[in-house]
C-alpha cells in the first residue's frame, strides 16, 4: 500500500481488496508479477480518483517495464549505475539503452546527470523520437531546503527543479511556494525512509537504503564527511 499515494495518503485496504477481488482471475490466467499487479492497481486508483497529475516510477529498466504503456507529459531519467544486470545488461551502455526506452515521441525528457559514456545514447534516442532533451546538471538553481539530507539529494533536487520548470512552461500552475513546501515534506508525502535518515544522535545511528555500488559510494562519502 505504501507504494500508492494521493497527496501523501496511502491507498486504503478496502481499495486494494476490491481491486484484487475484481481482477484475480485475470491475474492468475495471465501469470502477472506482483509489480505488474501493483501497476494496474495504481493506474486504476489514480483514474478513479481523477488525480490532476500522477508520478509513475519505473520498476526496473524502462523499455520493457509495465509502466511504459503510458504516454506521459514528461519523462525523467536519473543517473545510471550498474544494477539488475541479469535483466538489463552487464554494462552501463546496455542499461542506458533500456532506460532510454521510456523516451516517447514529441514528449520532453529530463536527464538527471550527464554521464559522458552514455550521453549520446539518450541524445540519439530523443532525436529519433523528436523529443526535446535537457540535462538537468547543465543548469544552476536556487538552493532549496529538503527534508532528505543525503548529499546525493542535491542531484535529485536539480533533476526535480528542471522537471518542474518544464511543467510550468506547459501551463502547470506551480509556484515557488509549492516547491518550497513540497521539498520540505518529501518524506511525509512519499513515505520514503532510509535516505540518510538519522535514527539517533547519541550515538549517531543512520539508516540509508543504498543498494548498489554507486549508491554505497555516495553513502560512504557522506559518512566520511560526517565523521571528520
Describe each region flagged by the PLM.
Residues 1-70, 88:
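ATP-dependent carboxylate-amine ligase catalytic core
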Residues 62-64, 71-129:
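Conserved catalytic-core segment of NTP-binding enzymes
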Residues 42, 122, 219:
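Aromatic/hydrophobic pocket-lining residues that form π-stacking "cages" and hydrophobic walls in ligand
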Residues 33, 109-112, 206-207:
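Short catalytic-loop micro-motif centered on adjacent basic/acidic residues
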Residues 48-49, 53-58, 66-76, 81-84, ...:
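Nucleotide phosphate-binding/pyrophosphate-handling subdomain across enzymes
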Residues 52, 108, 132:
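Residue-level detector of anion-binding/catalytic polar loops
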Amino acid at each position: 500500500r505504501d507504494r500508492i499515494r494521493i497527496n501523501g495518503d496511502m491507498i486504503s485496504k478496502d481499495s486494494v481488496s476490491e481491486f484484487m477481488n475484481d481482477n484475480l482471475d485475470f491475474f492468475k490466467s495471465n501469470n502477472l508479477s506482483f509489480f505488474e499487479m501493483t501497476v494496474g492497481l495504481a493506474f486504476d486508483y489514480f483514474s478513479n480518483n481523477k488525480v490532476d497529475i500522477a508520478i509513475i516510477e519505473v520498476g526496473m529498466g524502462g523499455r520493457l517495464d509495465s509502466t511504459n504503456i503510458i504516454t506521459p507529459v514528461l519523462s525523467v531519467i536519473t543517473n545510471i549505475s550498474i544494477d539488475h544486470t541479469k535483466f538489463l545488461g552487464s554494462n552501463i551502455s546496455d542499461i542506458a539503452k533500456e532506460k532510454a526506452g521510456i523516451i516517447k515521441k514529441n514528449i520532453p525528457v529530463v536527464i538527471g546527470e550527464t554521464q559522458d559514456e552514455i550521453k549520446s545514447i539518450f541524445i540519439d534516442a530523443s532525436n529519433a523520437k523528436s523529443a526535446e532533451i535537457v540535462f538537468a546538471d547543465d543548469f544552476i538553481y536556487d538552493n532549496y531546503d529538503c527534508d532528505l539530507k543525503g548529499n546525493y539529494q542535491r542531484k535529485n533536487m536539480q533533476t526535480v527543479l528542471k522537471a518542474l520548470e518544464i511543467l510550468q512552461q506547459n501551463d502547470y500552475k506551480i509556484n515557488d511556494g509549492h516547491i518550497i513546501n513540497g521539498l520540505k515534506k518529501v518524506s511525509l508525502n512519499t513515505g520514503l525512509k532510509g535516505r540518510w535518515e538519522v535514527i539517533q544522535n547519541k550515538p549517531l545511528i543512520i539508516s540509508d537504503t543504498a543498494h548498489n555500488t554507486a549508491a554505497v559510494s555516495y553513502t560512504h562519502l557522506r559518512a566520511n564527511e560526517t565523521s571528520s
